[in-house]
């Protein structure tokens, strides 16, 4: 199968925050296997080669020191009915990083302005949406003390078929003389970059 010309850059979550997102998704949208993540670049086609796009990510991220991100509140993108977790601390840095990355070989006219967030659930039947939103808010109160994480590693991903993504390579922030680590066994179905401006790497809002 020929992979699609659709690429995104994400930061996978770890620890209690990732567990909260993954567990909620599995309950609200059974069958969903996408890993919890924060999108830095929503999905886009490439007009240049993959190597050139990766080199651009490397140049930008190696010049950026790791920083803390703190998740905020559970809310809703009304137009797309996507339940998301806002970003409080770190939002300004994420927006600045997005603007630097969205240049050169990765330049793309995105449908929505970039808004840092973590997608919790989407494609929910409208009649179930408010119940799911309440459930997400109730569960988030238990996890909120673990809302801060360090953004230090990003992953460049490609859509291999509709809504199925594979990791291509990773890069550490602040490693000026380092190199991206190719993933020889990229995991498919990793995410659905539909990030309403930022979850599955698709910007639906």
Predicted regions, residues:
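Beta-strand-rich binding-surface signature
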Residues: 35, 82, 148
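Polymerase palm active-site segment centered on the conserved acidic dipeptide of motif C
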Residues: 145-151
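Short hydrophobic/aromatic beta-strand or adjacent loop that forms the aromatic wall/cage
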Residues: 8, 82, 151
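Portal/gating segments that form or line small-molecule/metal binding sites
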Residues: 71
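Short beta-strand segments and strand-loop junctions that repeat across beta-rich extracellular domains
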Residues: 152-161
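Basic, often amphipathic N-terminal segments
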Residues: 1-68, 76, 88-145, 162-205
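Short, basic/glycine-rich phosphate-binding loops at helix/coil junctions
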Residues: 75-82
